[in-house]
Curated annotation (Swiss-Prot):
UniProt name for this protein: Gonadotropin-releasing hormone receptor
Residue numbers on the Cytoplasmic membrane side: 58-76, 137-163, 232-280, 326-327
Membrane topology according to the record: Multi-pass membrane protein
Keywords (A to Z) from UniProt: Cell membrane, Disulfide bond, G-protein coupled receptor, Glycoprotein, Membrane, Receptor, Transducer, Transmembrane, Transmembrane helix
Any one GO molecular function term: gonadotropin-releasing hormone receptor activity
Glycan attachment sites: 17, 101
GO CC, any one term: plasma membrane
Species for this entry: Canis lupus familiaris
Keyword Transmembrane helix applies: yes
Entry's transmembrane regions: 38-57, 77-96, 115-136, 164-183, 212-231, 281-299, 306-325
Length: 327
């Protein structure tokens, strides 16, 4: 079957925009694997909400017990913002995915189609960027400790920049997502509304570029930065731990990494590992789809659902990680 020309594609998109319909052979339905995905999603939603909210409450109580006027340490401030980002992702991505898989159709209208699509991507950018901030901060803390000590506002600036970039990079979602109505192969309207990006890009490569940009900012760039930072951290830890292999005295002045800092460095490496392990399968599947869209017909729905659910474990694991290293 010959592919449509750009002019034909443009005419088809105009027809979709004017009639608010899209020809589709098979309308989606809620399958057994979809029901399992919904159940697991809401279970992870409860776990992540409880874990992250509990840590925020613990931080609040810890702050109240501190001496009046004494601020949180830089690491605790970073953990607070990572927890807020994880909680935001939990409260937006998980319920939205669960409810949409239940209804299959989009009942929330055009406005919420755009707004929720924006908030979903914003809440995914924020934890990824906050992970970068933590990795950079901890790496600089051991490679340039004096510079970090003299520049107390650097951490706050990086945190603010992470939230700002998350909001800016998610902005296109407000434009490209729209509500359409699907129809069956005969052209009969089924009243099947969906929130999609069909015909939002003038050329196919515009969408390809946007998808690659989003993928890079959500995964490739954060992964690259955290790997470099954590490689420096691991190298420094290894060098220090081998200074005295028989009796390591971390609290003595001859050691340039005290026990508390050593614990936070290990925690940073654990965060990066959790991020990499949880999200890599999901994005590998996405890359595969870009180069071979027919893979959806070869990869079963349970496998697709599993990779997505595995990614949702990341905001659940993070509170457990800083809970473990806080013992």
């Amino acid at each position: 079957m010959a592919s449509a020309s750009p002019e034909q594609n443009q005419n088809h998109c105009s027809a979709v925009n004017n009639s608010n319909m899209l020809m589709q052979g098979n309308l989606p339905t809620l399958t057994l694997s979809g029901k399992i995905r919904v159940t697991v999603t809401f279970f992870l939603f409860l776990l992540s909400t409880i874990f992250n909210a509990s840590f925020l409450l613990k931080l609040q109580k810890w702050t109240q017990k501190k001496e009046k006027g004494k601020k949180l340490s830089r690491m605790k401030v970073l953990l607070k913002h990572l927890t807020l980002a994880n909680l935001l992702e939990t409260l937006i991505v998980m319920p939205l995915d669960g409810m949409w898989n239940i209804t299959v159709q989009w009942y929330a209208g055009e406005f919420l189609c755009k707004v929720l699509s924006y908030l979903k991507l914003f809440s995914m950018y924020a934890p990824a960027f906050m992970m970068v901030v933590i990795s950079l901060d901890r790496s600089l803390a051991i490679t340039r400790p004096l510079a970090m000590k003299n520049n107390g506002k650097l951490g706050q600036s990086m945190i603010g920049l992470a939230w700002l970039l998350s909001g800016i990079f998610a902005g296109p979602q407000l434009y490209i997502f729209r509500m359409i109505h699907l129809a069956d192969s005969s052209g009969q309207t089924e009243g099947f509304p969906q929130c999609v990006t069909h015909c939002s890009f003038p050329q196919w490569w515009h969408q390809a570029f946007y998808n690659f940009f989003t993928f890079s900012c959500l995964f490739i760039i954060p992964l690259f930065i955290t790997l470099i930072c954590n490689a420096k951290i691991i190298f420094t830890l290894t060098r220090v731990l081998h200074q005295d292999p028989h009796e390591l005295q971390l609290n003595q002045s001859k050691n340039n990494i005290p026990r508390a800092r050593l614990r936070t460095l290990k925690m940073t490496v654990a965060f990066a590992t959790s991020f990499t392990v949880c999200w890599t399968p999901y994005y590998v599947l996405g890359i595969w789809y870009w180069f071979d869209p027919e893979m959806l017909n070869r990869v079963s729905d349970p496998v697709n659902h599993f990779f997505f659910l595995f990614a949702l474990l990341n905001p659940c694991f993070d509170p457990l990680i800083y809970g473990y290293f806080s013992l």
